[in-house]
Amino acid sequence: MPGAAVPGAAGRVAAAPCPFQLAGEEEGDRYHCGVLTVEQRRDRPAGVQLGIFFARLNAVEPVQPPLLFLAGGPGASGVYEVPLLAELLAPLRRSRDLLFFDLRGAGFSQPRIDCRATVHEGVGSTCMAALRSRGLDPMAFNTTQAAADAAELLAALGYVRADLLGVSYGTRLALELMRSHPQVVRAAVLDSTVAPEILTYELQALGDYQARVWPYADCEQNPRCRGRFGGMAGRFLALLNRLDEAPPAVLVGHVPLEASALYSLNNLVAGRPDRVALLPLIVDELDRGETATYRALLDQDLGEVPAVPARVGDASDQFLPRFELFLQSLSSEQAAAVRRELAGLPVEDPGNQALLALLAARRTPAALWQLAARMTSYERQRVLAAYGVPLALYVPHLLGDVKAIFDCQEEIPFVEPDLLRQNQSVIPLPALLPAYDFAEGISASQRSCREMGIGPAPLAFKGPVTATHPVLLLAGTQDTVTPMLWAELAAAALPNARLQRLPGYSHALLYQTGACVAELALQFLAAPTQPVAARCTAPIDYVLEPPLAVRLTGRTWLLQGWAGEAAAGSPVTALFSRGRVVGLDGCGTYAADFVVAGDRLEISDPVADNDSCTGAAQELQRAFLAALADAWQVTVRGDRMLLGTADGTLLVFVLEPDLPLEGPNWRLVALPAADEAGLPASLQIAPVTARFDQGRWLGVLGCNLYETAYAREKEQLLLGTLEPAVEMACVFPAGILEQEKRVARLLQGVTRYWIGGRELFLYGDSAAPSLVFYADP
């Protein structure tokens, strides 16, 4: 069978325990790990040997060549990510083995290059000297040698050819493998391409600019979008230039919108095609001085952000915080003794018996025993390292020091500062671009590489890869790390390449789209000459009018009544903002969480600050809060909002106009996230009030009445020094004076304000409000 592996060469491959576990599978049955021994320098076979760590997941029915996964970095561990990747690549595993390996010197491969563990400092000449004293040659750690390691691994495991899936740096390794070892590759899928020939520094700014302008240029190619908004790319650039002038062209909540913030909009929406679809609308509104959709995006009022696929924490991640809780239950002397015992456990501990014995002797909770019993050797060693055992272990999500060594050979020596400046000069927004002038930094990096004795790779390495294998290049249109431009350049040199753009997605598509990249890979590998398509390749469906969430949020709604029946009694209101709905309920105030998806509305059980009212007010409160919790559908038509409940009840609201600053009695309803963010005032220790009246500010901060002068001009607001009118040494309720000090400190830092309906936002230096008040009727 094409996917079957014959026994490897004797003595070159040794079994090793996997540093991970796969749910529902048995190690040694469905998956295996091991170490391939390779020569550090293939021209010196009697020299130092290196251990290349790998993992193999057996196919359900191996009828296809294996898939070799090549991780990013360089230096990221594909082996560590196996639990996540096994799930993402499950469709491919049905008919082919999945292979993962870590680069020489990185991940779980040994020896692992870790300068801090070696010389207690970062990458530099001291570390390189220490490595050389151990027989390690930094010049042997590069993409060319890594490609040879991959080819040897396939041969040692008995595979004739393999399909490749590379992500980010892994695409460079895949291309080098196709160039230098073409016989072992059948086809390749490249996700977020950075080919060997790409001048990454010189082309970074151009690629970044392309990604940020792409949605507006794409809108111009869409008849509906162009018909609604016109030439959006030109409008986007013109607005950026206007925002870079003074006075500011647009205010967002009385805060000037800076050009850099608009240019960075891509950072808020990348990887979310549904959010990218809003960009032309946002720019159109900002161009006309409107900010509703932009504010809704900043306030996260457009719905929840889907979770990005991520590796679930291993047993050591769960063990360590639980073990610390156990130690906190002991005296300081006992806890110190247990820590010493743990640090003294043997590094090699078959079955984790020594760790289990310590836990039993110390009578730790059963949950710790259970976690320890199922730990892999690597997970147990992570526990030991956390308590002081000096182990050079792979640290998840850190690339390690091989990246610096690779870059000294393959990137930094080839940077041409003049070309970098030339490329940046063609961009019409040089003053607004991020700091892409690497000239000074590059000179220092080139000098550092020379001092470390690491020279450039052969010039041929930087030549274009022209391999004839079938290649599918996947590029996210919003990728600013390995921009789409890089994939376009790489594809131009490959005679049998197909470039597939994923609109709205950014970097490392496999980790953003879930199984969608696996579906594209499956289609391509089955029929390399045929087009591929999946949900993640769909064009952007641009939003032409403000979505419901924008029309709903940031506004105060007054209950008129139930359909056909007017609401009697005290005012009832609702303000939807930043995932919270707050307002008056007939007796006091209430608050709840909410989520909008399409026209569907989900509201958590409201929390009221006053449940002691009686009579008609109590009936109104109960009826309203019950209906609010049962609401599931929302409609906004102009200045009217309709809430429908599951039992058919319809609540009718009308929009309240923005109140003036002076006149209303303002009550504090929200503190910063570090405090009691979003809670009703009664859930603070004591109510906080404020009133602005002809240059004088008066307010209760919990116990004492304060007053001071204030000055305002447009959106600017400054309060004088707060002084209590009559100072009382309040002691009840507990913490009331601390509340006064905290609120006073925030008030003294106020520099600007904004009013939306009955809500008053006070800002300090941050873009987020420091305090939020609500106007009592």
Name each model feature, range by range.
Residues M1-A4:
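N-terminal Sec signal peptide cleavage junction
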Residues V6-E285, G289-A337, E341, I405-F406, ...:
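Gly/Pro-rich cap/lid or specificity-loop segments adjacent to the active site
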Residues R224-R242, A357-R380:
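An acidic intrinsically disordered interaction segment
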Residues V312, E324-Q370:
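Ordered core of a single globular domain
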Residues A372, S377-Q381, L393-D401:
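Extended, H/D-rich, highly charged conserved domains that either
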Residues A386-P390:
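Short linear interaction motifs
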Residues Y542-P777:
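Lipid interaction determinants
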